[in-house]
Every structure is written in C-alpha cells, then in structure tokens.
Amino acid sequence: MIQFRKATLEDLPLLKQWDEDPSVIDSDPMGEWDWESELSKDPDWREFLIAEADGIPIGFVQIIDPQVEETHYWGDIGAGFRAIDIWIGSPAYRGRGLGTAMMKEALRRCFAPADVHTVLVDPLASNTGACRFYERLGFDFLEDRMFDDDACRVYAIARATWAQRHA
C-alpha cells in the first residue's frame, strides 16, 4: 500500500541520493533541485511528498497549483489545474506497479478539492516509457512544448476521465 507523507529536511540525504540515479537524471536532466532551500519552504501552492510502500520511502511526488506557482513554469494558466512531478528513487522499486499506485494516489489527492478539473504532467519527449505510462492511466496528449531547454510532451487528465477510470 502506498502512503504519502510530507517531505522534510530529514529526507535530504535520501533525496540527494535519488538525484544521482541515472533514471531520475534521465527523467529530469535539468532538475537541479536546491533541496535544502526548497524543503525549508512550505508555500500554499505546492506539496513535496515522500511516497512510502509498507513504511519504506520509495519515491517523490510534487503537486503544484500552476496558476499561482511562483516561477510561472506553466505560463498563463487558469484556475482549477494541478501539475504533478513524480519518480521512484530506488531501482529496486521500479517495475512492480508502485509508480502506478503512486500516481493513482497523487491523482486522488489532486482531485480531492471540487474546483480542480484537470491535472497536467510534462515528461521529457525522449522519455517514451513515461509517456506510455501516462497514456495508460488515461492522460491525453495535448502538445509538444519547450520548458526552458527541455523538449517535453504535455499531457492532461480531466476529472471526468479520472472518475470514470478510477472510481
């Protein structure tokens, strides 16, 4: 069973270790997270979460409200959206269905507020495995888009699609 808990400064060594994993690097090559700084902040528009399986930390999830996120990464976007970043940190936990369980829990969390109508993800275009993963979960491809220097594929899942597939 997957459970989320808030990421804290105590998770710093683990997050830094995961950042060195080649699969994590491949999924976010420009992702130079300043963990010390980011973990000490707690803005209303973001959740940093550690995913645990049977009490063992296995991955990381970030959920943001892109309308109010401070860097405006998603550009000018309306209300009712959430965006997710997700990865499994340790190779030992990949390929076991845990990523699917993590994403389903993240989506449940995103759609808990009644005003959220759409969840976005932006895997690298070169990360075809991640693209297939999101498609299997019911995400629809929206567009190819450059985020900084990264060529990404933007996917979205609407509340109605999620409710139909995962209710």
Residue ranges and their predicted role:
Residues M103-F111, E135:
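A conserved short alpha-helix in the GNAT/GCN5 acetyltransferase fold that borders
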Residues E36-Y93, R109, R159-A160:
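Acetyl-CoA-dependent GNAT
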Residues A112-D122:
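Conserved GNAT acetyl-CoA-binding A-motif
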Residues L120-C131, F147-A151, A160:
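Conserved beta-strand-loop-alpha-helix junction that forms the acyl-donor binding cleft
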Residues Y93, G97-A106:
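Conserved acetyl-CoA pyrophosphate-binding loop and the N-cap/start of the following alpha-helix
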Residues M1-L39, I58, A163-A167:
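A short, well-structured alpha-helix characteristic of acyl/acetyltransferase catalytic modules
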Residues T100-A101, A125-E143:
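Conserved active-site alpha-helix within GNAT-family acetyltransferase domains
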